Amino acid sequence: MKKKFFERVYSISKEDVEKVEEYFFDKGISNYYFYETKEGVFLVLVSEKKNFEENFSYKLVEERETSSDEWIKNLISKPFEFIDGVYIDPDYHEINDKLVIRITPGLAFGTGLHTTTKLAATLLKKYLRQGMDVLDLGCGSGILSILAKKLGASGVLAVDNDKMAVESAIENVEKNNVEVEIRVSDLLKNVDGKYDLIVSNIIADVLVKALEDMPKFLKKNGIVILSGIIDSKLYLFEHLNIVEHRRKDEWNALVIKF
């Protein structure tokens, strides 16, 4: 029996879209999207909770029960270009001569739609070299781990503190026929070994905490890709040895070396 969720549609102003995105990212909420009609901008949000957060004050215009499969299939029912030369496909469409990531519909982070995921993936594609060992810290759906493996990484370890995300990552890794080790871990607590590249797409305050121990898990000349940094939190990283800085909308991604 498929698990039921609550789908809500809210009316919001264009000016509040970025504010809502930041709020959801800080809360770890990714199961939403926006659409626009002549009547205005609408937010579609799916939650396991019958009553969403009390301080979410936008006007509710519609509510219904749905399943996780149903709503995300509606959202990403066709292949789309994730980053340059890389496509995401929720099914098994024929996409010739392209690198394709198959994502099973679910409510874990990382459908490939969020700006922070795209920034992290773009930098991963640029800096990953054949045979590198990669750690995906806060792996969500496993999208970055799968990309790393398809780009030629040797070993990939994916960790997340959310069991639901880990289950989703396992399913997606199997769907893509790649080898990725996946574990439940609160940041780096259940991580061992050393890596040529660490990629982490999580909120800024958690990234700061993780940075304290990251050098222990890096090989010589290893690099770190950090994404999920909102403009207002960028100052927390200005003291680091930043090799590259990319920005889109209000989101930032950094490549750093220790």
Swiss-Prot record:
Q: Provide the GO MF annotations for this entry.
A: protein-lysine N-methyltransferase activity
InterPro entries recorded: Ribosomal_L11_MeTrfase_PrmA, Ribosomal_PrmA_MeTrfase, SAM-dependent_MTases_sf
Give the EC number(s) listed in the UniProt record.
2.1.1.-
**Can you supply a Gene Ontology BP term from the record?**
methylation
Instruction: Name the reaction it catalyses.
Output: L-lysyl-[protein] + 3 S-adenosyl-L-methionine = N(6),N(6),N(6)-trimethyl-L-lysyl-[protein] + 3 S-adenosyl-L-homocysteine + 3 H(+)
Subcellular location(s): the record lists: Cytoplasm
Positions contributing to S-adenosyl-L-methionine binding? T117, G138, D160, N201
Q: Which SUPFAM superfamilies match?
A: S-adenosyl-L-methionine-dependent methyltransferases
What are the annotated GO cellular component locations?
A: cytoplasm
Q: What is its main location?
A: cytoplasm
Q: Which UniProt keywords are given for this protein, alphabetically ordered?
A: Cytoplasm, Methyltransferase, S-adenosyl-L-methionine, Transferase
- General function of this protein: Methylates ribosomal protein L11.
Q: Which family does it belong to?
A: Belongs to the methyltransferase superfamily. PrmA family.
Q: Write down what this protein is called.
A: Ribosomal protein L11 methyltransferase
